[in-house]
Amino acid sequence: MRRSIDDLPIADLPPGVEDDVPVSWAVAICDDYDDATPRVVLTVEEIGRAGTGLVAHLSPEHARRLRTALRDALVEVGEKAD
């Protein structure tokens, strides 16, 4: 099973960013593993260079940790926590 959840190209970089490479991220679910355990798949790659990015196969525990880190970062920049 593979199912895409969300994706977004991010080309609007803030001024002053020195390593200004526009990237795209995608989140999917996949269970194409020897143990058939579903995992969250996070892909980050440079826009226009499909297939050359980094892919993280996250267990539910690691996906929750990433979710918590993103929530905490949003709070740090003044956004309300969900």
What are these regions, as identified by a protein language model?
Residues 1-82:
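Positively charged, low-complexity terminal tracts
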